[in-house]
């Protein structure tokens, strides 16, 4: 935990540059905006960030993939472990894409699932936990963040799985049994609505029964101001990508 610039400087002596600073409190509006410190020149920005709340300073880990896992548990101890999915940042698409399945060595995927089960069972959680992992090119797995509840990235389950992560979480909280999970497609790519052509999205919404559409209007916003994701499903990631290109749903 760091609460002052002096704490940051002291920690940097041990972990070195680059490193990144992130908030510990979920209620802060910019909680997901981590600050990367490359040199002492970034101390001023670090000071501004710390002024808003307690932070954690961590070493920068060069990772090959950001892999997320959502696990749901009810009070009976039943578990529903969703398949790991990859979060991808691309210069061609604004925002974060979610891709399923993620290519992982069998041992790496087994360890990710084991850690997810261990955390949920150790905490005796009733509800949903979403864990972000950093996976290096050598197959080393680091836990990057743990959040109670389904993250936005879990929206891909609305079109790709027989039971969405959100519905499973509600079932767990109200004490209902958790059914078996069945993938509805071999692959899926979830695209943030902000990166898409709204007119083309509405066209596909009227035509498609095989895609998922997680569209909602935030409270207090203009009725036409939608947010969410479009989940493109297919036989493979390449097939999903081809559909994205053919339907021309990406903004130019």
Task: Describe each model-derived feature in a short phrase.
Residues 80, 141-145:
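Protein kinase-like catalytic core scaffold
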Residues 1-68, 72-122, 234, 238-248:
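Active-site nucleotide/adenylate-binding loops and adjacent lid/helix of ATP-dependent enzymes
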Residues 68-70, 130-134:
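Short, surface-exposed charged micro-motifs
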Residues 111-131, 147-195:
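Active-site "cap" helix and flanking loop/linker of ATP-utilizing ligase/carboxylase catalytic domains
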Residues 18-20, 54-58, 130, 179-180, ...:
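A short linear hydrophobic-aromatic micro-motif
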Residues 136-138:
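Activation-loop N-terminal segment of eukaryotic-like protein kinases
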Residues 171-252:
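Peripheral (often C-terminal) accessory segments that flank ATP-dependent C-N-forming ligase machineries
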């Amino acid at each position: 935990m760091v609460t002052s610039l002096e704490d940051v400087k002291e920690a940097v002596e041990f972990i070195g540059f680059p490193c990144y600073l992130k908030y510990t409190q979920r209620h802060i509006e910019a909680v997901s905006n981590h600050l990367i410190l490359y040199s002492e020149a970034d101390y001023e920005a670090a000071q501004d960030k710390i002024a808003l709340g307690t932070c954690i300073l961590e070493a920068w880990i060069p990772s090959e993939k950001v892999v997320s896992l959502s696990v749901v548990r009810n009070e009976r101890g039943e578990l529903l472990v969703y398949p790991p999915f990859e979060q991808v940042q691309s210069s061609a698409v604004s925002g974060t894409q979610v891709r399923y399945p993620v290519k992982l060595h069998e041992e790496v995927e087994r360890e990710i699932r084991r850690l997810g089960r261990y955390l949920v069972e150790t905490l005796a959680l009733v509800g949903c936990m979403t864990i972000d992992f950093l996976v290096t090119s050598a197959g080393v797995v680091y836990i990057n963040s743990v959040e109670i509840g389904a993250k936005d990235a879990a929206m891909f389950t609305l079109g790709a799985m027989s039971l969405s992560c959100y519905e499973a979480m509600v079932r767990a909280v109200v004490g209902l049994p958790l059914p078996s999970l069945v993938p509805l497609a071999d692959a899926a790519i979830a695209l943030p609505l902000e990166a898409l052509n709204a007119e083309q999205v509405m066209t596909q919404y009227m035509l498609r029964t095989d895609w998922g559409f997680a569209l909602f209007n935030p409270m207090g916003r203009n009725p036409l101001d939608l947010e969410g994701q479009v989940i493109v499903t297919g036989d493979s990631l390449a097939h999903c990508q081809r559909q994205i290109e053919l339907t021309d749903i990406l903004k130019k």
